[in-house]
C-alpha cells in the first residue's frame, strides 16, 4: 500500500503537481486526520495525514492522479457543550474541493447526531471530492474594468435566465454555456448592461425540509463547497469549470463584467439538527460562532454563522475569493448578508476579513458589493462598510416605491434618494457609485408584481404564506393579480415606467432585476427561493418588447447625461443638478417637506426630468429654453418644442434642450 509523504502545508485543498497530489486541511482541535480515497469500484483506502504544521494537517500521495475521489475523517472530542462535534464515522467534504461527485440528499446517515454521536458509517452514500487539474487557455482575455460611474448591473439566475429562451439551443438552455451564447450576449449589449451579476454558482445543497416537501433550493444561498461550481448548471459536471470560463471569456470580449453572488455567512449544515457535510466535523469550534452552551449564534436565519474573525476562516474566505478571481477571471462579488463579514462579534469596519481584502492586491482591485445587513442585533449596517465596498441601497428601493405607489413620501426624501443617498454614503471618501440603487431584486416582488399585488402569495412555498416580507410598498391599482381592464393595464404600465425611469436616471449604480425589463411575474410570490419552475424561469415568449425597448432607451439616455456618469457628488452651483418646482423655481423649504408631489430635476443643464406624482393632470412650466421630449418618451423624428408640459397623473417625462 502506498504511503503518504509529509507533503507541504500550503496551499489549502488538493493539488496535483504532475507526479502526485498534495492534501492539506485546517483543524485546530483535531487529534488525527484520515485521508480517504476511493477507487473506481468504490473501495475506500485510508491514510493518516502525517504532516502537522501548526493547525494545518497535510500529506502527499505519490502517483495520485486527477479524477481521484476523496474525503476526510477527522478524529477529536465529542464535547457539544464546548462546541466540538468530531465524528470519524462520517466522511467529510474538503472545504477547498474544486469538484464534488454525488448528491446532498436528505439521509439520516448524513447527520452526526445532536446530543449523542451517530456512529453509523456514511461513506457509501456521502458525496466525494474530486481532484482536478487546471489547464485552460484564456487567450487574450482581459477584465473590462468598467468604471463604477458607467456600471449598469443586471441581476440574474443562471438557469432561470435562459431555460425558456427559444433562440438558445435546447441542449444548453439554463447552463453556464448559455450565458456566453451570442443570443444572450447580444441581448445584454442591446439592453446596455455592463455587468452580469449571477446568483450563487458555488455548489449548494437543498435543505432537508425542502426535499421532504418535494421542493429544492433554487436561488442557491445554501453553500456546501465554496470552491466548486454547482454542477446542475453545467452540460457535463466534469467540464463545468471550462464551460463557466468559456462564458466569462465570451462576456468579457463583449465588454460585460461578471459579478458573483457569494455566501460567506453560513453553510448548508444549518442548525444542530442539520446535516453534517464538512465544517462541523472538521473544526466546528473554529469555523462557526458558538454560544456559551455550545449551540450556534444564528445571525443569518439559516441555523449557523461563519466566524469570519477567526484567522483560519479569514484565510479560507480570502483564498476562496482569490480563486474565483484568479482561476475564473470574475470581476467582482456581491456578498450575501455581508454584515457577518464584519462581526467580531460586533460589526467593525476594520474587521479581519475586511482588512485582508483591503490589503490583497487581487481582491482590492475588483468590484465589491455588500448586502449590508444580517438578522442579529446591530445587523443593519447600510452606509457603514469600508470604502472599497458598494452597498445595496434599500433606502432607494423603499423611497421609489413609496413615492410612486404609496404617494406618502416628501419631495425632500425622494430627492435625497435620487441623489445617491448622500446622507448615507457620502463619508470616508466614498463616491456616489457606493449606492447600489435597486427597485427590485431576486428577494421580493418582481417589478410587475409590485404594480399588480398588494399582498404576497407564497402558498407554493409550503409555509402557509408565512414566509417573505409583508413590507412590499406595492400597489395593485385596484385589482389583486394580473390582467384587468385596458385602463388598469395602462395605469400599471405608467407606474412601471416611472419606477424604471427613477432607477435608471438617478445618481448611483443602478441594478436591474432580470425579467423586469420585459414584464416577468412570479404571480405575487415574493420569496421564490424554492421555486425551480415556470414561476421563476423567464418566459421570453411572453416578453413585452415595448417595455424592453423602453428600458434600453433609458439606459442609453443615462449614458448621455454627464451628471450621472461622472461619479462625483452633486454640489450646489456645480451645474450638475437643479431642483425646481412646477413653475421652474427653486423649491421652498415648505415645498420640500409638505408640497405637492411635483418636481423638475435639471441634470447637466440640458436634461430635464419633469415629475407629476399627484392624482390630477397638472401643468408644469419648464425652465427657459427650447425643450423637446426625448426617447423613450417621444420619437426620434420631428421633435416638438414646448414650454409647458401637461403632466398626466402619476406621470413623468424627460426633455432635452
Curated annotation (Swiss-Prot):
Record organism: Escherichia coli O127:H6 (strain E2348/69 / EPEC)
Q: Which UniProt keywords apply?
A: Carbohydrate metabolism, Glycogen metabolism, Glycosidase, Hydrolase
Keyword presence, Hydrolase: yes
- A Pfam family recorded for this sequence: CBM_48
- Entry's EC annotation: 3.2.1.196
**UniProt xrefs under HAMAP family:** GlgX
* InterPro entries xref list: GlgX_C (IPR040784), GlgX_Isoamylase_N_E_set (IPR044505), Glyco_hydro_13_cat_dom (IPR006047), Glyco_hydro_13_N (IPR004193), Glyco_hydro_b (IPR013780), Glycogen_debranch_bac (IPR022844), Glycogen_debranch_GlgX (IPR011837), Glycoside_hydrolase_SF (IPR017853)
Instruction: Report the record's Gene Ontology biological process terms.
Output: glycogen catabolic process
Active-site residues are 336, 371
What protein family is recorded? Belongs to the glycosyl hydrolase 13 family.
- Under what name is this protein listed? Glycogen debranching enzyme
Can you tell which superkingdom this protein's organism belongs to?
A: Bacteria
Query: Which SMART domains does the record cross-reference, listed alphabetically?
Result: Aamy
* Biological pathway: Glycan degradation; glycogen degradation
Amino acid at each position: 500500500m502506498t504511503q503518504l509523504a509529509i507533503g507541504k502545508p500550503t496551499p489549502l485543498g488538493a493539488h496535483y503537481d504532475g507526479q502526485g497530489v498534495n492534501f492539506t486541511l485546517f483543524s485546530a482541535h483535531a487529534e488525527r486526520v484520515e485521508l480517504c480515497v476511493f477507487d473506481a469500484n468504490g473501495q475506500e483506502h485510508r491514510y493518516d495525514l502525517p504532516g502537522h504544521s501548526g493547525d494545518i494537517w497535510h500529506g502527499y500521495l505519490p502517483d495520485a492522479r486527477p479524477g481521484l475521489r476523496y474525503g476526510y475523517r477527522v478524529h477529536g472530542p465529542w464535547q457539544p457543550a464546548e462546541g466540538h462535534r468530531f465524528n470519524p464515522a462520517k466522511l467529510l467534504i474538503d472545504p477547498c474541493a474544486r469538484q464534488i461527485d454525488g448528491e446532498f440528499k436528505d439521509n439520516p446517515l448524513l447527520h452526526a447526531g445532536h446530543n449523542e454521536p451517530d456512529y453509523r458509517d456514511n461513506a457509501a452514500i456521502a458525496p466525494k471530492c474530486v481532484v482536478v487539474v487546471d489547464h485552460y487557455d484564456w487567450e487574450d482575455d482581459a477584465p473590462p474594468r468598467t468604471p463604477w460611474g458607467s456600471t449598469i448591473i443586471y441581476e440574474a439566475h443562471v438557469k432561470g435566465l435562459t431555460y425558456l429562451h427559444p433562440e438558445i439551443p435546447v441542449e444548453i438552455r439554463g447552463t453556464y454555456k448559455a450565458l456566453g451564447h451570442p443570443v444572450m450576449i447580444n441581448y445584454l449589449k442591446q439592453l446596455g448592461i455592463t455587468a452580469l451579476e449571477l446568483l450563487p454558482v458555488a455548489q449548494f445543497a437543498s435543505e432537508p425540509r425542502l426535499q421532504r416537501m418535494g421542493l429544492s433550493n433554487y436561488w442557491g444561498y445554501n453553500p456546501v463547497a465554496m470552491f466548486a461550481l454547482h454542477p446542475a448548471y453545467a452540460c457535463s459536471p466534469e467540464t463545468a469549470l471550462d464551460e463557466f470560463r468559456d462564458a466569462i471569456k465570451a462576456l468579457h470580449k463583449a465588454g460585460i463584467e461578471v459579478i458573483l453572488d457569494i455566501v460567506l455567512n453560513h453553510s448548508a449544515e444549518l442548525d444542530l439538527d442539520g446535516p453534517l457535510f464538512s465544517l462541523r466535523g472538521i473544526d466546528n469550534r473554529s469555523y462557526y460562532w458558538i454560544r456559551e452552551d455550545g449551540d450556534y449564534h444564528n445571525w443569518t436565519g439559516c441555523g449557523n454563522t461563519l466566524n469570519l474573525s477567526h484567522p483560519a476562516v479569514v484565510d479560507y474566505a480570502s483564498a476562496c475569493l482569490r480563486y474565483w478571481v484568479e482561476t475564473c477571471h470574475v470581476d467582482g462579488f456581491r456578498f450575501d448578508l455581508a454584515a457577518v463579514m464584519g462581526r467580531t462579534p460586533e460589526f467593525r469596519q476594520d474587521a479581519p476579513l475586511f482588512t485582508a481584502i483591503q490589503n490583497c492586491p487581487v481582491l482590492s482591485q475588483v468590484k465589491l458589493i455588500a448586502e449590508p445587513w444580517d438578522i442579529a442585533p446591530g445587523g443593519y449596517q447600510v452606509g457603514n462598510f469600508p470604502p472599497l465596498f458598494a452597498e445595496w441601497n434599500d433606502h432607494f428601493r423603499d423611497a421609489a416605491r413609496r413615492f410612486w405607489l404609496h404617494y406618502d413620501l416628501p419631495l425632500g426624501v425622494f430627492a435625497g434618494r435620487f441623489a445617491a443617498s448622500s446622507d448615507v454614503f457620502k463619508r470616508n471618501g466614498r463616491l456616489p457609485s457606493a449606492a447600489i440603487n435597486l427597485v427590485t431584486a431576486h428577494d421580493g416582488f418582481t417589478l410587475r408584481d409590485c404594480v399588480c399585488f398588494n399582498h404576497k402569495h407564497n402558498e407554493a412555498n409550503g409555509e402557509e404564506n408565512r414566509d417573505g416580507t409583508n413590507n412590499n410598498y406595492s400597489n395593485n391599482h385596484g385589482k389583486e393579480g394580473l390582467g384587468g381592464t385596458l385602463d388598469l393595464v395602462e395605469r400599471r404600465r405608467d407606474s412601471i415606467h416611472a419606477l424604471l425611469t427613477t432607477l435608471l436616471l438617478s445618481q448611483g449604480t443602478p441594478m436591474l432585476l432580470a425579467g423586469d425589463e420585459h414584464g416577468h411575474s412570479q404571480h405575487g410570490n415574493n420569496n421564490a427561493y424554492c421555486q425551480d419552475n415556470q414561476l421563476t424561469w423567464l418566459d421570453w415568449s411572453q416578453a413585452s418588447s415595448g417595455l424592453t425597448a423602453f428600458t434600453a432607451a433609458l439606459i442609453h439616455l443615462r449614458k448621455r447625461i454627464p451628471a450621472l456618469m461622472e461619479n462625483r457628488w452633486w454640489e450646489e452651483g456645480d451645474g450638475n443638478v437643479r431642483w425646481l418646482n412646477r413653475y421652474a423655481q427653486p423649491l421652498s423649504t415648505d415645498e420640500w417637506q409638505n408640497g405637492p408631489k411635483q418636481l423638475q430635476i435639471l441634470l447637466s443643464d440640458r436634461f430635464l426630468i419633469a415629475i407629476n406624482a399627484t392624482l390630477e393632470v397638472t401643468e408644469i412650466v419648464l425652465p427657459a429654453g427650447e425643450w423637446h421630449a426625448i426617447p423613450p418618451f417621444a420619437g426620434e423624428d420631428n421633435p416638438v418644442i414646448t414650454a409647458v408640459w401637461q403632466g398626466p397623473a402619476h406621470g413623468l417625462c424627460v426633455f432635452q434642450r
